Amino acid sequence: YNQEILKNVFLTPRYLKGTVEADLKTKLFDRVYDAPFGIAPIGMTSLIWPGAELSLAKLASEVNIPYTLSTVACASIENVGKHLGNKGWFQLYPPKDKNIRDDLLKRAYDSGYEVLVITSDIPASSRRERLRKAGVSVPPKINLRTIFQAAISPMWSLGILKHGMPQFATMDKYQKSQGNEKSKKGYAGSQMNRYLDWNYLEEVRNIWKGPIVLKGLMDNRDALKAKDYVDAIYLSNHGGRQLDIAPSPLQVLPNIRKDLGDEFPIIIDSGFYSGQDVVKGLMLGADFVMIGRPFVIALAALGARGAAHAHYIIKDEIENIM
């Protein structure tokens, strides 16, 4: 649905402008990035390609775009932070246990992450029927089907042998018992504070020393109130995976931009696959676009080289359109 909305947005070109030099550099939170897009937070990325978090972090640092590490990543805050050059973003699924929350924030800050992204749009676990039908599980179930899939994907299998079976590396240290991976998944899920409120945001605001972005907003009233608590809002419907009947962020973007004015930063994701999509988001009022699936699809196809190629294609498309 997100992509259908994007496909129905058209930009009318204007010509006779003389020589045009496209400048993609974008300033956000007093840092200048080389493009107006970054890598969105995606949980358990290493299920798709072993070592994915580290590959994406290294790429983002090399090409000077932000990479957002998820709370439910397969690599630790510290290990990924080493490759981000003090310009990483950390996405927080707010834990119920405030001691864990405070420790996560300290670890992220001490590891050089400069922007905190707080996810607000998971008050309940959604029914993801496609995942159920596909048999997706964490950890992966070992059966004839997965053995066959591993056999026909030798590079993925070799990567698993090198990096090990994906784990909740960021949350593992808080697991008191030495349970198996299934129990660790249950523990990580049990710690997610599904009912986020403004008081919780205020508490985080008093702890975190850098910019804070609130992710998952879709309503004008929430966006207006958020101005008093955070430094930017991040319009998202979780890539269409959380609530099927919610609108696309692109549909609500123009009105929210009108209500917030021109100066308050708006970030957007969900359905953005190409440079054309990025330009559409910018023209409708976003300051920055976050992209997820294209990078992990490219990783699954060609590993780190694939992610780098995806970045090149998206950036080249933006320059071409401009």
Regions found by a protein language model. Give the residues of each.
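Alpha/beta catalytic cores of nucleotide-metabolism and tRNA/nucleoside-modifying enzymes
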Residues: 1-9, 251-268, 273-322
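Alpha-helix-loop-beta-strand connector modules within alpha/beta enzyme cores
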Residues: 78-89, 144-150, 194-212, 244-268, ...
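An N-cap/entry alpha-helix motif that binds or orients negatively charged groups
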Residues: 1-30, 139-196
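Hydrophobic faces of well-ordered beta-strands that scaffold small-molecule active sites
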Residues: 37-40, 67-69, 88-92, 116, ...
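Structural motif
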Residues: 63, 83, 111, 207, ...
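Conserved, mostly hydrophobic/aromatic
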Residues: 39, 60, 118, 204, ...
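N-terminal capping/small domains of soluble enzymes
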Residues: 1-123
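Glycine-rich beta-to-alpha transition loops that act as phosphate-gripper elements at the mouths
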Residues: 71-74, 95, 195, 214-220, ...
